[in-house]
């Protein structure tokens, strides 16, 4: 072991240098770091000899390309996935037909360019060209003193095209007038306004409304709505059976169709006990053409449609087997019965309800089963310029006690309700106008102010509350069918648009399984002209129909129990027993119940006889 210079030389010779190796060009003036930086700058230049020829090319300068070899694969010489235009058109038509069916659910999609199938309408190219024409050639440069062309470019080449376009515009205009007639109650089974009395829509500036009529349109309410929609897999759109078109939220339907087409939308026609069965069945047939529709009477002790709705939710939970649970959100106008439906499904009061709008402030989760959760949402009121204050008030959007001058809305009530219904409800006759009617009602009830003057404001609020809470019978009739149009869908010929019952085996195969219920059953029903409404103490048509068919009110055999499948509640047998104890009434629209199952359930429910004692023989 040497020291000093000899030892350093030996370590370098054996390659045991601990520090950085010496870089070429490193000296006292240039460190290794500086030399590396200079080499980076020199790297982009080629090295040439004294004759100027490139001896060593710079980085990425060489033009010598290595020989490329194609992978020997047979797929290079086969045809690609091609499809003809005729096949694509037929496939597009088949997909469009299935999309229109509200009872079809897409379970799995193939690896196809769906943009080629779900393209825009046929006139999408014309609309795009018209948009580009307007942007490139504005109106001021085409018409007027600054016009730069003699003849404007029109989208119609012939008079026939112009006539066809005019007819389509006229049909759209007539459809809008028909919708106005339906909303005003001037169409349907007789009565109402004539065609000449329906005024056309004017585009004048709307006057200022009271602040109370902006309820349900705040940013907080819409945030709650979008939170419920984003958190839900199935959306239950609750609609009032007395005014289905007025309480139908088109904004939610359009939002789900464009932004969330994977979510399922279901219409729930609530409060069907306040309308005739014929009218409820007609509205269900109309609404089920767009989305699946269920009829519901939200009552804890005596519900109607509860079993069918639970069965439908179970079907959606089966469709989404990959998820641990599904969430069902209830949306709709205020005071249509969203929280009441949750209580009816659970069989006990779990959500706060009240006969006034705006009781639900924020969204809340409620457990229905182990795999199904319910989400309650505050009521929303989509802004619409055509909605007048009286329309919003009669839909139950605002609270009557907060409205100024309530007597000004009584004429709208008298227009919607037939005179004999008002006479039968309040036992009054012979009023001249709405003020005279309120004075007569106030004097009859003893509601007088100082000096013997009738309390018109108080009586008007009472009448409005009776109108919204169902004490005054009224309903909007369904639109009449056109000639040659059928209101029943294929495979759903039941009374309320449900599927046909299981036909008996002893019937002939050639005989039809069911017949449309609109001809036979509707003839026995009460005429809507003579409809007098239902009191809280009297039985409704739903209960009377159940009694005619021999079904008991207090039995739960025709109800679908919550613990019938693996979807049990989290609380186990305790909550299941509570729901079963509260189940009363009958469900007429439950499908698939056979006579054998009913006989077996009756045999199980009947107590077993005591065993007979055997006598022993004495020997």
Curated annotation (Swiss-Prot):
The keyword Nucleotide-binding applies. GTP binds at residues 332-339, 376-380. Pfam families: MMR_HSR1, NGP1NT. Keywords: GTP-binding, Nucleotide-binding, Nucleus, Ribosome biogenesis. Residues 1-10, 489-500, 547-556 have a biased composition (Basic and acidic residues). InterPro entries: G_CP_dom, GNL2_CP_dom, GTP-bd, GTP-bd_ortho_bundle_sf, NOG2_N_dom, P-loop_NTPase, TRAFAC_YlqF/YawG_RiboMat. Residues 222-383 form the CP-type G domain. GO terms for biological process: ribosome biogenesis. Residues 536-546, 565-603 have a biased composition (Acidic residues). One of its GO terms (molecular function) is GTP binding. Its main location: nucleus. It comes from the Eukaryota. GO terms for cellular component: nucleolus. It is found in: Nucleus, Nucleolus. Residues 1-24, 473-619 are annotated as: Disordered. GTPase that associates with pre-60S ribosomal subunits in the nucleolus and is required for their nuclear export and maturation. Belongs to the TRAFAC class YlqF/YawG GTPase family. NOG2 subfamily. This is Nucleolar GTP-binding protein 2. It comes from Neurospora crassa (strain ATCC 24698 / 74-OR23-1A / CBS 708.71 / DSM 1257 / FGSC 987). The gene is nog-2.
């Amino acid at each position: 072991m040497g020291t000093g210079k000899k030892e350093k030389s030996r370590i370098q010779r054996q390659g045991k240098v601990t520090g950085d190796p010496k870089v070429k060009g490193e000296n006292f003036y240039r460190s290794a770091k500086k030399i590396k930086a200079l080499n980076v700058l020199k790297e982009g230049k080629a090295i040439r000899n004294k004759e100027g020829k490139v001896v060593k090319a710079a980085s990425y300068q060489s033009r010598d390309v290595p020989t490329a070899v194609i992978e020997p694969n047979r797929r290079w010489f086969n045809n690609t996935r091609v499809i003809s235009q005729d096949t694509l058109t037929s496939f597009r038509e088949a997909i469009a037909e299935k999309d229109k069916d509200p009872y079809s659910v897409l379970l799995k999609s193939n690896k196809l360019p769906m943009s080629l199938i779900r393209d825009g309408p046929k006139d999408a190219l014309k609309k795009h060209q018209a948009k580009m024409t307007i942007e490139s050639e504005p109106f001021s440069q085409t018409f007027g003193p600054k016009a730069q062309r003699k003849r404007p470019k029109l989208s119609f080449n012939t008079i026939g095209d112009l006539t066809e376009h005019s007819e389509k515009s006229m049909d759209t205009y007539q459809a809008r007038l028909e919708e106005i007639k339906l909303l005003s109650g001037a169409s349907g089974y007789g009565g109402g306004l004539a065609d000449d009395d329906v005024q056309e829509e004017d585009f004048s500036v709307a006057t200022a409304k009271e602040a109370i009529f902006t309820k349900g349109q705040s940013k907080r309410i819409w945030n709650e709505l979008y939170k419920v929609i984003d958190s839900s897999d199935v959306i239950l759109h609750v609609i009032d059976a007395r005014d289905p078109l007025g309480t139908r939220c088109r904004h939610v339907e359009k939002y789900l169709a464009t932004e969330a087409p994977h979510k399922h939308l279901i219409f729930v026609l609530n409060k069907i006990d306040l309308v005739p069965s014929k009218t409820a069945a007609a509205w269900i047939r109309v609404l089920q053409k767009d989305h699946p529709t269920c009829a519901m009477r939200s009552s804890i002790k005596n519900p109607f449609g509860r079993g069918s709705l639970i069965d439908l939710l179970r079907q959606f939970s089966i469709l989404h087997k990959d998820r641990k649970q599904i969430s069902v959100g209830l949306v709709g106008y205020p005071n249509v019965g969203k929280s009441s439906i949750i209580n009816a499904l659970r069989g006990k009061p779990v959500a706060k309800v009240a006969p006034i709008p705006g009781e639900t402030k924020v969204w809340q989760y409620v457990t229905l089963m182990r795999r199904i959760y319910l989400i309650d949402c505050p009521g929303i009121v989509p802004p619409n310029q055509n909605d007048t204050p009286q329309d919003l008030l009669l839909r139950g959007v605002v609270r009557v006690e907060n409205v100024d001058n309530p007597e000004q809305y009584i004429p709208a009530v008298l227009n919607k309700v037939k005179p004999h219904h008002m006479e039968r409800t309040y036992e009054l006759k012979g009023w001249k106008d709405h003020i005279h009617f309120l004075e007569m009602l106030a004097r009859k009830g003893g509601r007088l102010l100082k000096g013997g003057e009738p309390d018109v404001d108080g009586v008007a609020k009472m009448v409005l509350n009776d109108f919204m809470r169902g004490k005054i019978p009224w309903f909007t009739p369904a639109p009449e069918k056109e000639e040659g149009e059928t209101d029943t869908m294929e495979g759903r010929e039941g009374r309320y648009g449900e599927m046909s019952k299981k036909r008996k085996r002893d019937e002939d195969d050639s005989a039809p399984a069911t017949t449309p219920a609109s001809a036979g059953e509707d003839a026995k029903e009460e005429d809507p002209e003579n409809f007098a409404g239902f009191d809280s103490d009297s039985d409704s048509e739903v209960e009377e129909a159940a009694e005619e068919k021999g079904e008991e009110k207090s039995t739960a055999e025709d109800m679908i129990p919550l613990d019938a499948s693996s979807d049990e509640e989290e609380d186990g047998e305790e909550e299941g027993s509570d729901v079963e104890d509260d189940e009363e009434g009958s469900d007429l629209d439950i499908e698939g119940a056979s006579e054998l199952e009913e006989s077996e359930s009756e045999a199980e429910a009947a107590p077993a006889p005591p065993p007979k004692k055997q006598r022993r023989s004495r020997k």
